[in-house]
Amino acid sequence: MELVVGRVAKSHGVRGELVVEVRTDDPDARFAEGTVLRGRLPRSTEVREFTVESAREHSGRLLVSLAGVDDRSAADALRGTLFVVDSAELPPSDDPDEFYDHELEGLSVRDTAGAVLGTVTEVLHSAAGELLSMRAAEDGREILIPFVTAIVPTVSVAEGYVVIDPPEGLLDPE
């Protein structure tokens, strides 16, 4: 399974730097100097390899320089490029309470009594922590669930579900 670890949002400056929207939990490793990235170009099935020359944070954004991308027009041509990795290449986690996003997406969401409430559609990473986005089985609306042990006490990737113990009001329609 191919996983997106970053997306080129736009160019930055005139020397070919790229603003990359990070979609990985470890950008320091993924975008380290010398790392070879596979990039899926927009509106194309072509995948190219790019070597990271440098990466730095600037105003809360990741700026990346790639070998051979030396000016603004070359950087602009990469706008929308998705940097991808194969999930089979990811190392297994040493922590049983740590999961890759793709392992959680698609899991059934149950309450503590076992009733199916919905499906995890996405894992969102925010400054305040991770959130599970759930599509409610009842009406299809999106519900954001803080991914903390107090609210999500059980995760069973092997059995295909998470159990939530929602605080009052979390599941209520607005």
UniProtKB/Swiss-Prot annotation:
Residues 96-170 form the PRC barrel domain. Disulfide bonds: none annotated. It comes from the Bacteria. One of its GO terms (molecular function) is ribosome binding. GO terms for cellular component: cytoplasm; ribosome. Gene3D superfamilies: PRC-barrel domain (2.30.30.240), RimM (2.40.30.60). It is found in: Cytoplasm. Keywords: Chaperone, Cytoplasm, Ribosome biogenesis, rRNA processing. One of its GO terms (biological process) is ribosomal small subunit biogenesis. InterPro entries: PRC_barrel-like_sf, PRC_RimM, RimM, RimM_N, RimM_N_sf, Transl_B-barrel_sf. It holds the Pfam family PRC_RimM. Binds ribosomal protein uS19. Belongs to the RimM family. An accessory protein needed during the final step in the assembly of 30S ribosomal subunit, possibly for assembly of the head region. Essential for efficient processing of 16S rRNA. May be needed both before and after RbfA during the maturation of 16S rRNA. It has affinity for free ribosomal 30S subunits but not for 70S ribosomes. The PRC barrel domain binds ribosomal protein uS19. This is Ribosome maturation factor RimM.
